[in-house]
From Swiss-Prot:
Compositionally biased intervals (Polar residues): 347-357, 374-387, 431-446, 566-584, 677-695, 778-794, 1039-1052
PANTHER family cross-referenced by the UniProt entry: MASTERMIND-LIKE, MASTERMIND-LIKE PROTEIN 2
GO biological processes: positive regulation of transcription of Notch receptor target
Compositional bias per record (Gly residues), positions renumbered to this chain: 12-22
Gene name linked to the record: MAML2
Superkingdom classification of source: Eukaryota
Record carries keyword Ribonucleoprotein: no
Protein name: Mastermind-like protein 2
GO cellular component assignments: nuclear speck; nucleoplasm
Low complexity compositional bias, start-end: 113-122, 395-426, 453-473, 484-497, 590-649
Originating species: Bos taurus (Bovine)
Record PTM Phosphoserine, positions in chain: 177
UniProt-annotated location(s): Nucleus speckle
Length: 1128
């Protein structure tokens, strides 16, 4: 009959005028909402018809089960008396059916007994339907007396199903009376489930209802509650049992809620209340029976009838269920993860709960950090070692933040809060122990694990990508912290890397790195970034973010200890952590640094461009990162805005601890002390210089410069960095706007100058003359000067670092110079170090190509150009940065092209670069020594270098693989890969790819950077060295985004040159490094677009036109008329 009832549903809906009449008033309007209202009306009519059929069936069933009702009444009484004893005895299938149906799966057994007892499956179910409807009708009519019997029956049934009915009724006696009515309304499902039992219990409940009214009612309620509670753990079960017990799936959480829900539905469907009740029960039955299809013989019919109502109720039920899911998830997370609150805080701290997160971060840091290792469970052990000690060492003050940093990225990615929870759960087991233990072990193991973790992080490139996702915000702090500290930075960076590689370190690194970055070097991000970015925050954001990190990290992986020293410039910090992670990690790190770069740079003049560009970068970088690290997307975007905030709370709070850690790490790393101590001096210089440079953002620069200059090493610097962090972030915000405006103005001026230089670009593409150098200087000085406002300081600061490193590690700088220049190139700090090397080293190696060929001199000279990171890197510095950045990708070209930073390039370019570099180093060294102006001379030098590079390119020496290899040793990890890849690419496709590739990176960069890179990319499209100059600031950022997008587009390069890829992009956009960018298809094209474009404007235009369809928008922004006019 249930089957016939559903067929009647349409009939009822259509012909059930009375039933529809109840809703008929709104029939016209429902017809407007015909799909829903008609279904509801049809269901109501069907429910009424079904109620009638159920009523008839119920009457028949009652007649049939009158004996069974008596028996069940006696049995129910005995069951109520005996409680579970009778139920356990299960003498009657009703009791078993009740229990089974209440349990949920057993409805099948219950249905057979019910069917047997009812004699007809359809007959049993219909009577329950009628009974339900009758109960609902009584309930809707509020006739507790009438419903008393039904309620009593149903209530008695729940008692049968629940052993503790009397106890529950005693507790719920009063509530039970009300809830019992509601639950009885719900319990019709229960009574319906055992049709015979329901029928019996209906009569029996009438009898029992007097004495067992409360007990049965509460019993019924407890049954629902028991199921609800039992099932609340398992939402599906809770819903199902509630559907069983409550007959309404919607109130799975609360059986009273079921009644309330039914009441609400009744009120909604007030007129057909009985029908509604019936339909509800039918729906509840249907849901119950859909879940337990065989519970009632009538179920199929009801299900057929109720599917839509069931959907509606299921939606309502789902509505109620999600809260259950949320609460349950929270409870599960809290229960499963003791650190769940930290987890939530982590999720919220950077994204939503930033306030609690600082306090919880320590716990959550481990979870988050461990979660990052969870992503990298393989390296998780090492992250755990590091996280437990090194990570929590940071997590002492910053482990929470570290964890929150990586996991907040998860919240930011908030597809992952559950994964984070799962990962946190997986990790919590370790982390639960390591929260306290880690903090304890952190102090003891912190130093060892800092070093170990650095190594481990080198072994954690895989976790690095995943971790940055979880450590999305962490990348910001992480990137910040990464950049400044090479060794400490690495250690904190490793922790910070750890969220990326290890996780614990992630947020801890965030904090610790923040401490390092912001404490010792308030801007690990800012300092190196500022150092790098101040000269050209845009280029730095790209070339530094992209290039310095990759270069640094690859090199650092190659010459980790050296980069410890040099990474004192924050390059090592990342490389040492990232050597193995550098490929995936470098992207994160680079991406994080771009965030930080945008953060740091944003406070600087480039804040707007870095933000605009870096945001696209971060958007695009997350794409590669998404490929490698999906979370970094949220990390960077969220970290960029969040990072200042998270850095402040995350970094500031842990600053004292991290100061201690930094001091300890500094003590642990006295070797870096050479660079760091000198760097500290330089850091102070950098503070002063960067303060001068940063102007509004001296604190970011001091932070970043101190970072670069072993900022964390200095507790003074740490204190300064702490203060500077607040000032920095505040100034960053202010300077972000100011410098964004300045950057926009500069970009506009650069674009205007680009237009004029485009003529010279045409000349200088072939061979950038000194005029173009001057123009580039002007452009570079305009942008870089503004960008380099801290650039001179950066150069000076890094020069100081470079002095410290070159002086202390002059020999190291020879290998390290590549490494350092890579490291420095990798990070702007390296650039300044290179700049200092150019100043100091520039004096030493600058004039001396051999010294410069000691990649330190050349690379650092180049990288001081990288400090002009746009400028220097655009030409030779561009190459060194691509070498740095492109250790794998651009390194090849960078090294070869720059030769400067690169040994091979140093050698080949040394003939050219060396001569030119001898001259250029003279110039550039002067320029680099000039630092800010050096950046401009670096542009000029880059022009010369670009000429030389082009000569090398056209000579085929372009970027000698030897250079790449020479540089690769330094950047062996990524440089070898990217260098070889790009050396191959760079050598062969340099001219060919450059036109098209150049356009591609330009397009991607412009696209990546969107409007922001567009202007610089337009300049890039203009493709004069000046274009590189102007573009490179943006394009370094764009390059970062581009290389990151390229990293996306070029995962292979990304792997090896993932960060090199960004660096490459930076390099690619850094003028001459377009040749270096040759390493990338995009950047190679750009680089060679410099070359080929230099060689032929037609090729450049062809590359613009042919490289990508995306060039259309990009070309629109570029003003092909200008390019064509200049190039034609």
């Amino acid at each position: 009959m249930g089957d016939t009832a559903p067929p009647q549903a349409p009939t009822g809906g259509l012909g059930g005028a009375p039933g529809a009449g109840l809703l008929g008033g709104g029939s016209v309007t429902p017809r407007v909402h015909s799909a829903i209202v008609e279904r509801l009306r049809a269901r109501i009519a069907v429910c009424r018809q079904h109620h009638l059929s159920c009523e008839g069936r119920y009457e028949r069933g009652r007649a049939e089960s009158s004996d069974r009702e008596r028996e069940s009444t006696l049995q129910l009484l005995s069951l109520v008396q005996h409680g579970q004893g009778a139920r356990k005895a299960g003498k009657h299938t009703k009791a078993t059916a009740s229990t089974a149906t209440a349990t949920a799966p057993p409805p099948a057994p219950a249905a057979p007994p019910t069917a047997s007892q009812t004699a007809a499956p359809a007959a049993p179910a219909p009577p329950p339907d009628y009974h339900h409807h009758h109960q609902q009708h009584l309930r809707s009519s509020s006739s507790s007396g009438g419903s008393g019997g039904i309620d009593g029956e149903q209530q008695q049934q729940p008692p049968a199903s629940t052993p503790g009915d009397q106890r529950n009724s005693a507790l719920i006696a009063l509530q039970g009376s009300l809830k019992r009515k509601q639950i009885v309304n719900l319990s019709p499902a229960n009574s319906k489930r055992p049709n015979g039992f329901v029928d019996n219990s209906f009569l029996d409940i009438k009898r029992i209802r007097v004495g067992e009214n409360l007990a049965a009612g509460p019993g019924g309620l407890p049954v629902n509650n028991g199921q609800s509670q039992m099932m609340s753990g398992t939402l599906p079960m809770s819903q199902v049992p509630l559907r069983k017990t409550a007959a309404l799936p919607p109130p799975p959480t609360h059986s009273p809620g079921n009644g309330l829900f039914n009441m609400g539905l009744k009120e909604v469907k007030k007129e057909p209340g009985e029908t509604l009740s019936c339909s509800k029960h039918v729906d509840g039955q249907v849901t119950q029976e859909n879940i337990f299809s065989n519970r009632y013989g009538d179920d199929p019919g009801e299900q057929l009838m109720d599917p839509e109502l069931q959907e509606l109720f299921n939606e309502l039920t789902n509505i109620s269920v999600p809260p259950m899911s949320d609460l349950e998830l929270e409870n599960m997370i809290n229960a499963t993860i003791k650190q769940d609150d930290p987890f939530n805080i982590d999720l919220g701290q950077q994204s939503q709960r930033s306030t609690p997160r600082p306090s919880l971060p320590l716990e959550k840091t481990v979870i988050k950090s461990e979660y990052s290792p969870g992503l990298t469970q393989g390296p998780s052990g090492s992250p755990q070692l590091r996280p437990s000690s090194a990570g929590p060492a940071f997590s002492m003050a910053s482990s929470g933040l570290s964890a929150s940093s990586p996991i907040p990225s998860v919240p930011q990615s908030q597809a992952q809060p559950p994964p984070a929870t799962g990962a946190a759960r997986a990790l919590p087991s370790w982390q639960e122990v390591s929260h306290a233990q880690q903090l304890k072990q952190i102090a003891a193991n912190r130093q060892q694990h800092v070093r170990m973790h650095q190594q481990q992080q080198q072994h954690q490139p895989t976790s690095w990508p995943a971790l940055p996702s979880s450590a999305g915000p962490s990348p910001g702090p992480f990137g910040q912290e990464k950049i400044p500290s090479p060794s400490f930075g690495q250690q904190p960076f490793s922790p910070q890397s750890t969220p990326m590689p290890g996780v614990t370190g992630g947020s801890n690194q965030s904090k610790v790195m923040a401490n390092y970055l912001f404490k010792a070097s308030p801007s690990a991000q800012g300092g190196p970034l500022d150092v790098l970015l101040q000269p050209k925050p845009q280029d730095l954001s790209r070339s530094f973010l992209n290039n310095p990190h990759p270069a640094m990290e690859p090199r650092h992986g190659s010459t980790k200890p050296l980069f410890h020293f040099n990474s004192d410039q924050a390059n090592q910090q990342m490389p040492s952590v990232l050597p193995s992670q550098s490929k995936p990690s470098l992207l994160h790190y680079t991406q994080q640094q771009p965030q930080q770069s945008s953060i740091t740079v944003q406070p600087q003049q480039q804040q707007q461009q870095p933000q605009q560009q870096q945001q696209p970068q971060q958007q695009q970088q997350p794409q590669p990162q998404q490929q490698q690290q999906q979370q970094p997307q949220a990390q960077q975007p969220a970290a960029q805005p969040t990072q200042p905030l998270s850095n402040q709370p995350l970094l500031r709070a842990p600053l004292p601890l991290q100061q201690k850690i930094l001091l300890q790490k500094i003590q642990n790393q006295p070797i870096t002390g050479l660079g760091y101590q000198v760097s500290q001096q330089h850091r102070q210089d950098q503070h002063s210089v960067v303060g001068q440079n940063a102007g509004p953002s001296p604190s970011p620069n001091p932070c970043s410069n101190p970072n670069t200059g072993s900022g964390y090493m200095n507790s003074q610097q740490s204190l300064l960095n702490q203060q500077l962090m607040g000032k920095k972030q505040t100034l960053q915000r202010q300077i972000m706007e100011q410098k964004q405006q300045l950057l926009l103005q500069q970009q506009m001026l650069a674009d205007a100058e680009k237009i004029a230089p485009q003529d010279q670009i045409n000349r200088h593409l072939t061979r950038p003359p000194p005029d173009y150098k001057d123009q580039r200087r002007n452009v570079g000085n305009m942008q870089p000067t503004a960008q380099y406002s801290g650039g001179s300081s950066t150069v000076s600061l890094n020069s100081n670092q470079a002095l410290a490193n070159p002086v202390s590690t002059h020999t190291i700088l020879t290998p390290n110079s590549s490494l350092m220049s890579t490291s420095h190139g990798t990070r702007m700090p390296s650039l300044p170090t290179a700049v200092q090397n150019i100043g100091i080293y520039g004096n030493l190696p600058c004039s001396q190509p051999s010294t410069y060929s000691v990649t330190s001199g050349m690379n650092q000279l180049t990288q001081p150009r990288n400090p002009n990171q746009l400028i220097a890197n655009q030409n030779n510095p561009l190459m060194p940065r691509p070498p740095t950045l492109g250790p794998s990708n651009n390194n090849n070209n960078n090294v070869a092209t720059f030769g400067a930073g690169s040994v091979g390039n140093s050698q080949q370019l040394r003939p050219n670069l060396t001569h030119s570099m001898a001259s250029m180093p003279a110039q550039r060294t002067s320029n680099v020594m000039i630092t800010s102006n050096t950046a401009t001379p670096n542009w000029a030098s880059q022009e010369a270098t670009a000429k030389q590079q082009e000569a090398l390119k056209s000579a085929g020496v372009r970027f000698p693989t030897g250079t790449t290899t020479a540089y690769a040793p330094n950047q062996s990890l990524q440089q070898a890969v990217g260098s070889q890849q790009f050396s191959q690419r760079a050598v062969a496709p340099s001219n060919q790819l450059t036109p098209a590739v150049q356009m591609r990176p330009m397009n991607q960069m412009s696209q990546t950077l969107n409007g922001q890179n567009m202007g610089p990319l337009r300049s890039l499209n203009l493709r004069p060295n000046q274009l590189s100059t102007q573009l490179l600031p943006t394009m370094n950022q764009a390059g970062t985004g581009l290389s990151q997008s390229r990293t996306v587009s070029q995962p292979p390069s990304l792997a090896a040159g993932g960060f090199p890829s960004p660096n490459q992009s930076s390099r690619a956009f850094q003028g001459t490094d377009h040749g270096n960018d040759l390493a990338f298809d995009f950047l190679n094209q750009q680089t060679d677009n410099m070359g080929p474009a230099l060689n032929s404007d037609a090729d450049f235009i062809d590359s613009l036109l042919k490289t990508e369809p995306g060039n259309d928008d990009w070309m629109k922004d570029i003003n092909l008329d200008e390019i064509l006019g200049n190039n034609s």
